[in-house]
Amino acid sequence: MTARGNLFIVSAPSGAGKSSLISALLQDKPADKQVSVSHTTRQPRPGEVNGQHYHFVTKEEFKALITENAFFEWAEVFGNYYGTSRKVIEQTLTDGIDVFLDIDWQGAQQVKKVMPEAIGIFILPPSRTELEKRLTGRGQDSKEVIASRMAQAASEISHYNEYDFIIINDDFDTALADLVAIIRSQRLTDTGQIHAHNDMIQGLLAD
């Protein structure tokens, strides 16, 4: 019997290393885990591919999807809309694949209302100075955008206690090991093990 996949919510202030950690995690045994590809109205960044990094849509298209109740969760962030497909998430979990939602605290609250068993992981930078350094080093945003992200960071970080796990991304390898440990621990819960190994367990209990 295939165990149902786990839904992981991963949030962090922009520049904390969330996307890099998820990307590194998915390189190991990618068949049993995947990141949800969100819909967004923001413009693609250099190197981003439609359908791979995001489903890029217009605001009119996004609002139509909201009306159709097509999103598991959605939120407006920095003037752009982001949303997660309800149908895709449910089918992927049913197939026994862990799904990672790369979303902010607003989206996390919506998901928890629909699926309380979702596991929340919040990633923190070691300091505000390091966070600003990382944002600047990415070379993706203007000084104005970076200033806006730094101003928003404190508000985002204030929701850290709404999550089940907290990872400090000071050393990348250590943070990745912590993330792997969280994923593994959820696979080893009694519910997960019963679904995955029910026949074996019943055999052990047989007279």
UniProtKB/Swiss-Prot annotation:
Keyword vocabulary terms for this entry: ATP-binding, Cytoplasm, Kinase, Nucleotide-binding, Transferase
Pfam family of the protein (one): Guanylate_kin
InterPro entries: GK/Ca_channel_bsu, Guanylate_kin-like_dom, Guanylate_kinase, Guanylate_kinase_CS, P-loop_NTPase
Subcellular location: Cytoplasm
Gene Ontology cellular component terms for the protein in this record: cytosol
Domain Guanylate kinase-like span(s) in chain numbering: 5-184
Principal localisation: cytoplasm
EC number(s) on file: 2.7.4.8
Catalytic activity: GMP + ATP = GDP + ADP
Amino acids binding ATP: 12-19
A single MF term (Gene Ontology): ATP binding
Top-level EC class: transferase
Annotated function: Essential for recycling GMP and indirectly, cGMP.
Family: Belongs to the guanylate kinase family.
HAMAP family in alphabetical order: Guanylate_kinase
UniProt protein name: Guanylate kinase
